Amino acid sequence: DKTKPTILIYHTHTTESYQMLDTDWFTKSYQTRSNLATRNMVRVGDEIVAQLEAAGFAVIHDTKIYDATYNGAYYRSEDAIEAYQKKYPQLQVLLDIHRDAIQTNDTTRIKPVATINGKKAAQIMIISGCEGGGVTDFPDWRYNLRFATQLQKICEESYPGLMRPLYFCNRQYNMH
């Protein structure tokens, strides 16, 4: 039922973008952020939504830019999440899709890619948080971790090499 979506795709860092060149290196002059929906995380979200809808899921794709100023982006996206959950209480899966950014100590940037069906694809990493350190009042972290490991397993079985190791950390982000 399209009127009762169960999945929300959103982007706390909406303007994160990809280098549109097929190279194995990162060019420092490349702008890592874009307000163009065809070049930033909205485009990635559109592809995910299309696949989920083709599989029969009802999905909301929030394309709002929360990182016009980087600081405070998580608070702004959290407000939106709460509004969506109030409007659509049947939501079961909320995915905050980001571009991965790997930087070494010497500031070298790495592009994690895999070859899937003969084409280069950006690898995916799932982040799952938990209580600990300064993170408290996170009662569903075990459920989130189980979901994350199952999603990781399905993706890796379907597309070997696509998934980076799951990142499990004492952080909550907007995972509640």
Where do the language-model regions lie?
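N-terminal catalytic or cofactor-binding beta/alpha core of small enzyme domains
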Residues: 1-90, 101-106
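Active-site microenvironments of hydrolase-like enzyme catalytic domains
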Residues: 12, 80-81, 87-131
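Mid-sequence, gly/pro-rich, charge-dense loop/helix-turn segments that line enzyme active sites
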Residues: 41, 123, 133-135
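Loop/turn elements at helix/coil->beta-strand transitions in domains of secreted/extracellular proteins
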Residues: 54-58, 88-93, 122-123, 161, ...
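Short secondary-structure boundary motifs at beta->alpha junctions and helix caps
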Residues: 128-141, 149
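Active-site-adjacent substrate-binding region
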Residues: 140-166
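Active-site-adjacent mobile loop/cap segments within catalytic or ligand-binding domains
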Residues: 163-176
